[in-house]
Amino acid sequence: MKAIDNKIEQFALYLQRKNNLDHIQFLKVRLGLQVVVSNLAKTIVTYGVALIFHTFLYTLFTHVSYFLVRRYAHGAHAKSSLLCHVQNLALFVALPWLLVYFQVNLGIMYSVVAIGTVLIIYYAPSATKKQPIPSHLKMKKKLLSIIITMVLLIISFLAPEPFKQLILLGITLESITLLPIFFPREDN
């Protein structure tokens, strides 16, 4: 990992020299590169494991529906990169597989996602200390979160099984990240 950090540092320094960036701009560029590399690594691990366990499409449908809502609803993050990897594997590889394997009843899934939709309506967007949401964007993000959730619900009615359950799972997982219990007092 140290070698990757060194390469990021070298590339950020190169960009700083090439574009006459001040120190703050350099730090922003370096952080951006670190985030991209970290997210790429998490994606490779998650989808690599999904391929190994033959759950790629299950993972993809769950993850895409989760991400589409999260794009505007935001929500809690894992406390560390390792915990993020573990949560990704549990929530986007193991849980979709279990959902399909046990053939969870659609009535149960729609009941759970109804509660999740209420959580999205009530709590979205949910800012964090590291990722605050400007007040002028809050209403727009709330509306987009609700609209995307409704569109995904409509798609779930049209999608074949097990993909409808996986779409509903993605919505439900995202709605759970909005709960205030996942935010320290100072983040609220």
Swiss-Prot record:
Q: Could you tell me which InterPro entries the record lists for this protein?
A: AgrB (IPR006741)
GO BP: proteolysis; quorum sensing
Keywords of the record: Cell membrane, Hydrolase, Membrane, Protease, Quorum sensing, Transmembrane, Transmembrane helix, Virulence
Annotated TM spans: 49-69, 100-122, 143-163, 164-184
UniProt xrefs under SMART domains: AgrB
Question: Where would you find this protein in the cell?
Answer: Cell membrane
Entry EC no(s): 3.4.-.-
The terms describing its cellular component in GO are: plasma membrane
Q: Which GO terms describe its molecular function?
A: peptidase activity
Q: What function does the entry list?
A: Essential for the production of a quorum sensing system signal molecule, the autoinducing peptide (AIP). This quorum sensing system is responsible for the regulation of the expression of virulence factor genes. Involved in the proteolytic processing of AgrD, the precursor of AIP.
Q: Which family does it belong to?
A: Belongs to the AgrB family.
Protein name as it appears in the record: Accessory gene regulator protein B
Q: Which gene encodes it?
A: agrB
